[in-house]
Amino acid sequence: MEGTDDASALQEPPDPEVLEVDPTFRYIRYKEVIGKGAFKTVYKAFDEVDGIEVAWNQVRIDDVLQSPNCLERLYSEVRLLKSLKHNNIIRFYNSWIDDKNKTVNIITELFTSGSLRHYRKKHRKVNMKAVKNWARQILMGLRYLHGQEPPIIHRDLKCDNIFINGNHGEVKIGDLGLATVMEQANAKSVIGTPEFMAPELYDENYNELADIYSFGMCMLEMVTFDYPYCECKNSAQIYKKVSSGIKPASLSRVKDPEVKQFIEKCLLPASERLSAKELLLDPFLQLNGLTMNNPLPLPDIVMPKEGAFGDRCLMSEGPPTTRPSKTLSIDLDEDSNLPIVTFSDNSGSRCIEVRRAKRGNFFVLKGEENDEQSVSLILRIVDENGRVRNIHFLFYQEGDTASKVSSEMVEQLELTDQNVTFIAELIDILLVNMIPTWKTDVTVDHLIHSQLNQNSRSHHNEAKPQKQEETVFHDTCELVSHSCNSDCPRSDEEDKQCVDATKGEDKSSIQEVEEATEPVSLEEEERLRQELEEIEAKYQEDMKEIATKREEAIMETKKKLSLMKLK
């Protein structure tokens, strides 16, 4: 009886906004209408089990019974939604027939920003980067539909049937009422919205590439804000133009040649039209394509395997740099195998950088002491092709050894092509220079002995006072100090440039063997100082840009992790 009483309470809710409850008492329908079509009304609803807002699609049976085709469309949509699961296809939750109220009810996920058409008209000033992002998501949904066995054709793709969550730009294809499973090689029936229908649809002989034509028209609508063929007064005029191969007038208003070319690819005759899978590879849609400010490509985040070390380690892997490197190997002598150790001051905290080369790869280990217990380390590995791997990790002074951390790093991050001992030597060299009492667990005396001697002598060298001083050591050469305002540690992708820039500074501004050098002229000194200032200005400019990109990458990764946890 208690359950019955609860049910009665739910069926007659005190909230005046709640108009209806589903048979399982899980979903409640509000009176707020969020969409309306010829036969279907969409209400805002709430899932009381998962605590999320959903869409309650309701169709009156009396309305669809007047048109048997509409009833079949409705059942077709329910069947398809139940079977499809993809990030860019609207998600189905439940459906039922209410005999008492004579309605068919479908619960789907809710899109707070409505249709893409409505959203685009509301936000008219949107960068092409966002439009490309929407296009990629639509194509990924189409690739999924067309990749089914047998393929599924949407047949009514338009911005009205594509939905968006504006808070994070998620786009999904919906309204599958006209979709069909292509049992034969070609479908036969004529159906869809005339403005978006491919020419072959009128000939009743088409396949899934008809959706690509519609997608092209969606792109046209997204960039012009108008329905294709809005110059036509009726469907007959549209049919006449489409069958004659006349493109919409709005296509001539697309000024960006790349955008126009991409749309035209989608509107080619069916025999020449590319598939969704092929269009996703088009240069126009590539993530690293040119945008307004030509950003640097973002690194991919590589998560370590599960384990204790994985909790304090992260690797990002970037593509080869597009900027030529002229100074990458100038001051790293692979034959001597001796490292370069650099000291700098970062807001009162001492930073140390160790650089070393091995078999065409260049290693840069940077460290900054957090407190008495731990040191923040960043290892950059730059291969001969310019690809950069960046490993961020914490080193605990009590309990950690260079060999232990190096072994775990190579195993967890699958750095199979790197030598454990080589990385351990880098770590111990840095720690010996940072912590005077540090006890190494690998032999590094042969690598640091001459450096320590040079370090004691370098304090006698005269140099102009600067905001920051770096003392650089290299095998038999004693190098005098020079200024460098770069902070340590630096950001991910920028480090590749920063390594190159630092090496350029070393070559151009550091005098070589003490007894073999001659005094530098004032003009030469001024030229070198200007060169350093130019490098620093360029560095600061790039750092500002990469910091923004890094933040975006971190936020995107966090979002993906959150979505994975929800699944």
Swiss-Prot record:
Any GO molecular function: protein kinase activity
Catalytic activity, as annotated: L-seryl-[protein] + ATP = O-phospho-L-seryl-[protein] + ADP + H(+); L-threonyl-[protein] + ATP = O-phospho-L-threonyl-[protein] + ADP + H(+)
Domain annotation Protein kinase: ranges: 28-285
Coiled coil: 519-553
Binding site for ATP: T108, E109, L110, F111, K158
PROSITE patterns per record: PROTEIN_KINASE_DOM, PROTEIN_KINASE_ST
Induction pattern: Expressed with a circadian rhythm showing a peak before dawn.
InterPro entries: Kinase-like_dom_sf (IPR011009), Prot_kinase_dom (IPR000719), Ser/Thr_kinase_AS (IPR008271), WNK_Ser-Thr_kinase (IPR050588)
Keywords: ATP-binding, Coiled coil, Kinase, Nucleotide-binding, Serine/threonine-protein kinase, Transferase
Protein's UniProt keywords contain ATP-binding: yes
Active site residues of this protein: D175 (proton acceptor)
Stretches the record annotates as Disordered: 499-528
EC number, as in UniProt: 2.7.11.1
Bias (Acidic residues) ranges: 512-525
Pfam families according to UniProt: Pkinase
Cystine pairs: none
Keyword presence, Kinase: yes
One of the protein's GO biological processes: protein phosphorylation
Basic and acidic residues bias (residue ranges): 499-509
Function statement: May regulate flowering time by modulating the photoperiod pathway.
Assigned protein family: Belongs to the protein kinase superfamily. Ser/Thr protein kinase family. WNK subfamily.
Name the record gives this protein: Probable serine/threonine-protein kinase WNK6
Lineage: Eukaryota, Viridiplantae, Streptophyta, Embryophyta, Tracheophyta
